[in-house]
Amino acid sequence: MSKGKVLLVLYEGGKHAEEQEKLLGCIENELGIRNFIEEQGYELVTTIDKDPEPTSTVDRELKDAEIVITTPFFPAYISRNRIAEAPNLKLCVTAGVGSDHVDLEAANERKITVTEVTGSNVVSVAEHVMATILVLIRNYNGGHQQAINGEWDIAGVAKNEYDLEDKIISTVGAGRIGYRVLERLVAFNPKKLLYYDYQELPAEAINRLNEASKLFNGRGDIVQRVEKLEDMVAQSDVVTINCPLHKDSRGLFNKKLISHMKDGAYLVNTARGAICVAEDVAEAVKSGKLAGYGGDVWDKQPAPKDHPWRTMDNKDHVGNAMTVHISGTSLHAQKRYAQGVKNILNSYFSKKFDYRPQDIIVQNGSYATRAYGQKK
């Protein structure tokens, strides 16, 4: 008889799991943790069937599970109703970063611990942000489509192609990912790097960016915190979103906020899809208010085939830089978050509960971070 059940919900790898053994984040490869879990005397149940609620395999198996592990890239939504139907549930683990798929208030009420592998994919996401910015501002899609379609219209591409140099670029959120985006942007000699966050960056972090810009670009004091979001987006040529999803950020980028942005600005979102109102963003791209929107996160995952972000575009067909949710799940990131999940489970199985402080989202009925809510 097992000590308890661990429910693992991941995306299906299919033939790709056979071709690439490092694809740990798929259901076939199980984060490489099956043997470890079974050695601890626990049962591991795996599934890809997470929807619809309340008739999915997740609903059935969660009822007597002690631990549930899921991922931001294919999230099983641990809703209030699902928590109410799972009396044995004690630990929710996110294989990656971002735990908004868990009803954190309901978890607090039940004193369920929610953890994630903080830092596991911050470099991966920051690199994807940079790639998306460059795809948009350099009109990569326009040139690529001509190349594969047998065309050669240089002017048709160049009329929508710009440099990052001398641009004002901003981030909503300047945490582990947002700061790494700012670090990488310094190399492009921006005019200003702006950030909007509930707390100011440490002076040392700001000085590091300013000094690097002064040394390599001859331009100092480029980093500035902006108190009002509307003021920041009004100045910015490129806006990137790098903050968690919570009640105050849900639907933040709507028609009203977008109206404050520069005409022809670019918006990049690798945080959470629901931070943006899908229809409002699509309309802004279509009208030309936004020159482009890119990212990899969707308000529902997997996104339905008729999601407006799949087909949104501008008159020149170069305004869409969307991908599926891949920014934080490179093979390197998968190795890091698989090991992080194992470390969290080891802390739980040993009854030491000595999780890394930065990995704890809620514990003992209260928030352990201000990223999703105020400490109580």
UniProtKB/Swiss-Prot annotation:
Enzyme class, broadest EC rank: oxidoreductase
Catalytic reaction annotation: formate + NAD(+) = CO2 + NADH
Cell compartment(s), UniProt: Cytoplasm
Keywords, ordered alphabetically: Cytoplasm, NAD, Oxidoreductase
Any one GO BP annotation for this protein: formate catabolic process
GO cellular component terms given for this protein: cytosol
Positions contributing to NAD(+) binding: R176, I177, D197, P244, L245, H246, K247, D248, T270, D296, H325, I326, S327, G328
EC number(s) from the headed UniProt entry: 1.17.1.9
Keyword Oxidoreductase tagged: yes
CDD domains the UniProt entry points to: FDH
Cleaved signal peptide residues: none
Residues the record lists as binding substrate: V97, N121
GO molecular function: formate dehydrogenase (NAD+) activity; NAD binding; oxidoreductase activity, acting on the CH-OH group of donors, NAD or NADP as acceptor
Record's note on what induces expression: Induced by formate.
Residues of the site described as Important for catalytic activity: R272, H325
UniProt cross-references to Pfam families, sorted A to Z: 2-Hacid_dh (PF00389), 2-Hacid_dh_C (PF02826)
Free-text function comment from the UniProt entry: Catalyzes the NAD(+)-dependent oxidation of formate to carbon dioxide. Formate oxidation is the final step in the methanol oxidation pathway in methylotrophic microorganisms. Has a role in the detoxification of exogenous formate in non-methylotrophic organisms.
Family: Belongs to the D-isomer specific 2-hydroxyacid dehydrogenase family. FDH subfamily.
Quaternary structure and interacting proteins, as annotated: Homodimer.
Protein name: Formate dehydrogenase 2
Source organism (scientific name): Saccharomyces cerevisiae (strain CEN.PK113-7D)
